[in-house]
A protein has these predicted regions:
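Catalytic cores of TIM-barrel enzymes
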Residues: 1-155
Length: 155
């Protein structure tokens, strides 16, 4: 079975040839994995382990055009994401310190004006990840969660 056949069989409650696999890996893990396995930088961890599912996501943030790197130094980087939040990340760290939010006054969310949901820029990364998933033989899944799940990032 192909990955898509396997995943669709499982979703349809039909027996696949094996359980469809999904995992996601931090970049630091993949780098260490390549070192430990003696593999070069082109080694694809998802192909190595037979991952079947690829999650493809458009940019769900309210202001994708405002995402930017604001400052970089030897100690780290300061960025603004598409939610309007300011993040300070130390060099070599995966997690960040939140240094600011878009909605400082939590009483007035209706005043916010978001960029158009149909803007082409929101879907460029989605289309690239979809093409990559298909080329790699994985079953692509599109998801949304930003407008509902991630609005906490505004505050």
């Amino acid at each position: 079975m192909t990955s898509t056949e396997r995943v669709l069989a499982a979703i349809a409650d039909q027996p696949p040839d094996r359980i469809p696999l999904f995992d996601s890996f931090w970049a630091e893990f993949v780098q260490r994995w390549r070192q430990e396995k003696g593999l070069d930088a082109s080694a694809d961890i998802e192909a190595y382990y037979g991952i079947d599912i690829a999650i493809c996501v458009p940019d769900e943030t309210p202001w994708p055009s405002q995402a930017a790197e604001l400052e970089r130094s030897e100690t780290g980087v300061v960025t603004r994401d598409g939610w309007g939040a300011i993040h300070r990340t130390r060099s070599g760290a995966h997690f960040y310190q939140e240094a600011g939010v878009a909605l400082a006054d939590k009483r007035d969310p209706e005043r916010l004006e978001f960029e158009a949901p149909e803007a082409d820029a929101r879907y460029a990364g989605f289309l690239r990840s979809l093409a990559h998933a298909r080329a790699a033989g994985r079953c692509p899944f599109a998801k949304t969660g930003g407008p509902y799940l991630r609005t906490m990032n505004l505050r």
